[in-house]
Amino acid sequence: MINNGKALNNKKSIDYSKLFRHQAKFVAGAIHINQIPDFSLPEIVFVGKSNVGKSSIINTICNNKSLAKVSNTPGRTRQINFFNIVDKLIIVDLPGYGFANVPISVKEQWEGLITYYLRNSHNLMLVNLLIDSRRGIKENDKKVAELLLANKREFQIIFTKSDKVTDRENLNYEAQNFLATLNYLCNVIYVSSRNKEGMRELKASFAQCIKHQR
């Protein structure tokens, strides 16, 4: 497990598996690196390609349907969004990557913001690399995984929109090969915001990760 080298708020033992019974609230947004806040709380991060379903998953996990804005238009999330769960845990929603229909300068700004945060956050405990189960693992996903490993960030693969895929054998094989090339072992979880598949496992993985790292 990774120790990011900063003491976090740990006045008493917290049962993180029960935190998600509480609604989260939006507390900050960052468009530039100098706007990134430091809450000195554990951070669980969601990153993935544009329109992968990040907002829907975050809303489902955080028990708040209107928390993160859901859109069918790729590139809707244009800043890093921070959501606070009863001053015990921060959920972080990063802008989607790989969206081409924006000016190059804007795309470079998003990528720079994402990269800076992933490299420099002292409170980051776990990164959820979200991948559309209908599309499989793409080159952009591989680059993000390599960035995470280069910066010693713990991550797990989350296949989203699992209700739309019936045959998972090829996906499992693809994920295993992908992780083997990285020489990395992690959770692979299928989730759906529609039928709630995988939500319990996802929350449990957060609690387990934080427990081991603190």
Swiss-Prot record:
GTP binds at residues 48-55, 75-79, 93-96, 160-163, 191-193. PROSITE patterns: G_ENGB. Pfam families: MMR_HSR1 (PF01926). Keywords: Cell cycle, Cell division, GTP-binding, Magnesium, Metal-binding, Nucleotide-binding, Septation. Mg(2+) binds at residues 55, 77. Necessary for normal cell division and for the maintenance of normal septation. Belongs to the TRAFAC class TrmE-Era-EngA-EngB-Septin-like GTPase superfamily. EngB GTPase family. This is Probable GTP-binding protein EngB. It comes from Rickettsia prowazekii (strain Madrid E). The gene is engB.
